[in-house]
Amino acid sequence: DNAVHLGDVYNNSGYPFIDAGNGGSIDGIIAFCEGTLAQINKDTVVVPGHGPLSNYQGLADYIAMLKDIRSQMMVLIDAGASLETILNAGITKAYDGVQGDPGLLLNRAYFSLTHKVVDR
């Protein structure tokens, strides 16, 4: 009765895939998740595209993680950092133990924020 399915936008077992090549962005994922959070309540079952069932707080934590990573990336991007610099800056270190390898997330987020194509 009180459930929402977020598909691949919410990955509860790793970092999300940002389809930056087709217009996806870290900002779009954050905005969609925030919009969903505003429409659910603490009793809502949140069904991610990958990983175990979650809830309101789990989705709120996911949004906070993405906003933190985005914020740290923008500081580096605004300072002229390359993707390689961002990959080596350790900005996801607090989350990597649970989320896994951040390489693809950082690559796609970098592209979505700068529109620079970088092979990696």
Give residue ranges: language-model regions.
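Metallo-beta-lactamase
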Residues: D1-D68
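Accessory terminal helices/loops
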Residues: A38-D43, P52-R120
